[in-house]
Structure formats: C-alpha cells, structure tokens
Amino acid sequence: MKKKFAVFAVILSSFILFSCSRSGVVISVDENDLFKLNYGSFEDELNMFDISLTGNISTYIAMRDGFFYIANGESKKIMETNSYGDLLSLYYNNESVRNLEFEQEDSSVSTKKSVKYPFNTLGPIAVDSRKYLYVVDTLPQDRFEHDEENRLLLNNVVLMFDVNGQFVNYIGQQGLGGTPFPIIRKIYTTKKNELVVVCTTNEGLLAYWFNNRGALLYRIPVTAEQIPMPADTEEEEGRYYTSVGNVVPDYNENKLYIKVDFYQEMLDSTLKKNSGVTYRKTLLYALNLNNGEYEAPLEIPAYEHTILNDMSKTTDEIPFDFLGVTENGWFFFIITNEDGYIVQMVQPDGQKIFKRSLTVDHSQVFYYTLDLSSSGIVSGLFVLRNYAKVSWWRTDSLLAAYISN
C-alpha cells in the first residue's frame, strides 16, 4: 500500500552464526568495558551532581570511528576521547570548567584541543565524517520563543563546530541562525554529512533535514493520523490505535524510517463494551522524501516476555524500541529485560533476524545513554555509584560475518 505524504521541500542553491527463533535462547554478546570516568570538576571527569537524587540528567554519548564524544550538560562541557579514555578535545564553558591542563600545554606541539563556548544546557550529540560536531543546547530564558498556534515552547538549537573546533553557527528550524526548535529528541548525521533533527510536538514528531552546510532541505511532520493503516486491520472488529515510537533517517538515502506500534480495542462480547486495548503488532514504515510516498511496511517481531507461575505460564508481547539503522541498512531494536538488554537486528528485507543479549546489571546503574554507530556498534555510558564507565558491544562483527558469507 502506498500513501502520499506531505513533505515540505525547500529548494536551495568472531561470532558463530545462530539464527534465533522468536522463542529460542538468546545468545549473549560480550561487553567490552573500555574506560572509566571519575566524578568531579576536573577536565577529564564527569559532573553528575548528586546521582542519588531524582531529576533529569543531561549527559549523552556518541561514537564515531572509535572516538567517543560525551556531552556532559551538568558541567557544560563536551569531551572527545579515544577508546582508552584519553582526553583529546574539550569544548567547555569557562565559567564552569577552570584550571585546564590543556591551556597550559604548548599548542604548537600538542595535538589536544580546547574550545571555549558559553554552553547552557547540553543535549544529544552527533559527529559526521568530517569530524564536524553537532550538539543540542538550550537557549537562555530571555531568548525563548513561543509558537502560539501549535502551543510550543521554542528554546532548543543545534550548535555546529568544524573539524578544528571553530564554532560555525547555530542551526534552527530554517537553517543557520533560524528560529529555535521545540524539544529535540535526537539528532543524526548521514553519509553525505547531512544533519537530521527529530523534535517532539503536541501532535507527534517533527523531523528537519539539513544539508552539510546547514541549509534546510525537508521539514517532515509525523503524526499517528498520517500513518497508513494496514489492510488487515479493516477486517477486524474493534478500533485500532497507532503509536509512533521513533523516527530515524536512512544513512545513505533520503528516507525516514518510522516505527509504529498498533493497539486494538478489545470488546466484551457479553456487555458489548470496550474492555481495554491490547498490543497487536509493530510495523516499520519507510517514507521516501523524494516523492512523499510510504513504502510497504516491514513487520517487526515483538519481544516475548514470559512469566512463570506455580501452575501456569503467561507470555506477553512487548514492542521493541527503535535504536537506529546502519550504513548497510540493518535495523536495530532494543528492549530492557532482567539481565540487561535484548538487541534485535533485522535485515533490510526482513528475511534474517538476529537477537542478542547485552548483559547489564541494572541494579548498579543510576543512568545510562546508548548510541548506535553507522557500522553497527552499540556503545553506552553508564553512571554507577562511584564512577561512570564507557562500554561497547561489537555487534558489527556479527553482521560483517553474516554479510561476508
């Protein structure tokens, strides 16, 4: 089924390969703990304030070509490290970070880089193949704007730094220097070094697609009402409800992938009344931005959560979260379970599905943030009681071995 969608275009000048069945045993992928980060105010430490208190934590991670980029909103700085944890670059607000060893080194011989910028509240971060760095920041309150028509507070921008750490400009809704965004959920970069910004609105999600110079190419609203309904839902009793879970850009093409969960209204046959809703299935839609059409959706198997009682067994289906897509077109989905996470990797045509377990002791973790690289490596920053750690799982090796065969 194809459905036209309104796209606003702006024309401007070593694993053993086991195929996991849906109910089979899930094989674990070894976690590689790469390095630790202490808590504190020094340049190579994280400032997490009091991690025992409730509240939002504004710390995010991205990995590119083996280098890690950590946006630590609590200390208003960004750290670039290698896989050993050596600090290579520091972007910082000089009112929050002082007495830097970086500043004391001879810049003519040092390969380290320090960049001053008046960060406010940092958010998600991304890096392209040029090593241009993009990071979400919140404007000072006196620069907030309001979208009265859509009832939105506009206070997020994306800051753009070049390979030398030079601040280029901030990106808003129209491009360089544009109107601030509503709440930004996530940012992505593509093979062509284009930037995709995904925002949350009162109606759903809103994606902005920019070229590698920060000029707006597409503005794409995504709401539940615009999603094509599967043909089989029209033949069943009980109303269907749609929930848009996430929007992720394709790495190579002008496409957006939209994960949609479908729920069905349950009817009591005796009372002829609604008795609740139940999860039915998850579909992944590809929206072609060149022609505004949805391609045929791909059904994504749900996670089966089994509860064993004394004399019975109950199995519930729970939809996965959409983590991202690799440069080879594999779709990654993830869900939390008692042992850590289950990652489900789906081939572009859906013919092959791998499930792997990522073991994490949730009882020791106060906060975490995950990242999927374009090559298929899952990385994570985990905030523990006495320190934070950066780990990765080489799920890319599994895919590479399968593709080579």
Predicted feature locations:
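Eukaryotic scaffold repeat domains enriched in small/polar residues
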Residues: 20-405
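Bacterial N-terminal signal peptides
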Residues: 9-17
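Bacterial N-terminal signal peptides that target proteins for export
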Residues: 1-8
